[in-house]
UniProtKB/Swiss-Prot annotation:
Record's keyword terms, sorted: Cytoplasm, Methyltransferase, S-adenosyl-L-methionine, Transferase, tRNA processing
Summary of the function given for this chain in its UniProt record: Probable adenosyl-L-methionine (AdoMet)-dependent tRNA (uracil-O(2)-)-methyltransferase.
Location within or outside the cell: Cytoplasm
InterPro entries in UniProt: tRNA_uracil_MeTrfase
Basic and acidic residues: compositionally biased ranges: 573-600
A Pfam family assignment: AdoMet_MTase
Descriptive protein name: tRNA (uracil-O(2)-)-methyltransferase
Low complexity composition-biased segments: 470-489
Region of interest (Disordered), residue spans: 455-489, 537-606
GO cellular component, one term: cytoplasm
PANTHER family per UniProt: TRNA (URACIL-O(2)-)-METHYLTRANSFERASE-RELATED
Compositionally skewed regions (Polar residues) per UniProt: 455-469, 546-564
Name of the coding gene: trm44
Amino acid sequence: MARALALSRSVQVCKSRLFTVASKSAITKRCLSNPIQYRSVSLFATTYAPSKDLNSRLHSEHIGDTALYLLLNPGLTSSVLFRADILAQSGKCPTLAALEAQKQQETEEASTATAMTMAQNVIEEEKEVKEPVVEIPAREVPGFELHKTLIRRLIPRNQQLDMPVDQTCHLYSHAGAVEQIEKEKELGIPHSRAPKERFMVIYTPHVSSKEELPYYHPLVRSMAFVYEFGYTGEFEGPENSIPRIAENPKGTMSIHFLPYENDVDSISARLERSLTKLIEVQIRTTKGRLDPCRPSTSSPYALIKDNVIPRNRVQDTYSRLKNKYAANLNERWIESTEPSKHVFEDLSIAAFLIELWRDLYGAVPGDEREQQKQQSSTSKVGSGQFPGFVDIACGNGVLVYILISEGYSGWGFDARRRKTWSIFPTDVQERLKEEIYIPKPFMDVLAAQNQGPIQNKNQDASMQSPLSEPQSGQSNGPNSGTSTSTSLSNLPKDTFIISNHADELTLWTPILSTLLNPANPPPFLAIPCCSHSLSGARHRFRPQSARPSATQNPQKQQGENGTHSQDEEGSSEDMKERKGEEKEKNPETGDLEQMRKDKLAAQNPH
């Protein structure tokens, strides 16, 4: 039997830091001169050493919901982790995993039948046979009842550095007499004791020694998260009178852990810091979900963000792309900007697009397609007709390079050639064009003003890029065969448009999609950055404000005789005059010549 830890030395060293964490959580305010109280709680046959307790007034039901959410999303407590895959579960109560599966099913049902069929075929043929996972037996804890058992696999971000680890999570609950006391209070029946309810989760990794534990996991054999919630009895009258139940309940949150035999005499600063952070994240997340100022977080659905593509697929593809391309791109980067920001951002976008195209078209990366051909000559995986892509304002071209290297045909263009283009293979450089795209509506106006077609290298029709006939499973982009001229307006009608930080062309992205195929516009992906208007000028769009109701300000809405007041009319006229003056001072047409004149006039007022 392991003995309780002697925490006095660690407490004296880390006293101020522990109090800082408590103040951040805003759970209790204790004077710094007061000593930190620790207690050893023996809930099991083995004595567990507890961390610092924090007083809280959060209901155990809310704590339990948050514990389930953090159990499925360990990345909130450790930046090293991606996610947790649920391998097995048992119990009666629904979990957030079930809610997530239900939400994903609703999203799939809303998609088209063709896309669903392709996605289902791909997913079914990609399923791997998983090894059976043995569940660690649950402990019998006095006063607690086993509520649910989950077996999860912690997936790290860098699996070449950290290994995944399986973990059995036992969820216990103890309602106590709180519900009964509440009913008795409504009926006016006196009470003789202060009730409590408790919630507990025990995490046990599937390892035989601490050497098998990865870096991100605390060096403990097992860990128990305990939350006790109840009412404090306050006596009134004689000594033997019935206690009055306080209106404000109190909760106590603590973490108990079972150390290894060689670590029972001390607690490392890293372990103490990790356990304290677990409590802090638990409280902060629970309070955030219950914050009335953020009603959207009160629903479990609001916490689920991967409604388009399942998170595990995007993360696995991102890890594969990062291991394949990140090091090489960072080493060969020749731009003056920081490579890590651009490289990893484009890798994540590429991972999302690859999984999106898998569902939309049934197209898979080239390596995966070759593996499927070797395994089965009759396999249909990856045989979907991919229409090709175009990356407008492609910038450094990293996204185009990754997608082409993964076997997806397409091309990109930008107004200025970038240094990064030179580090790519020749076939990729041929698909990166230095062009300026002027939308067709503007070219029609210019052509009408000049009474004839304009021969200018900056016009839409000048973007000549030969296309070849699509091959089986793919379609080729520009510069891959014949010399047929094309432009953005003459691209294949199903071309997928990528608008990644396209600035002036961001608003034009859905319009370009509609111009390609008005009857059935192709899908596109727009990731906005700087805000511009359709004219190309910088413009910040203000959010639409809700109109005040007539019951809130009736005097401003209507005068005594049923007409608008004179003050309102005067203010509206003044507003129109001010807007007219601002319009004259600040041209919004994108006229560079006029803007330059205004700038020179401001610099030389005399």
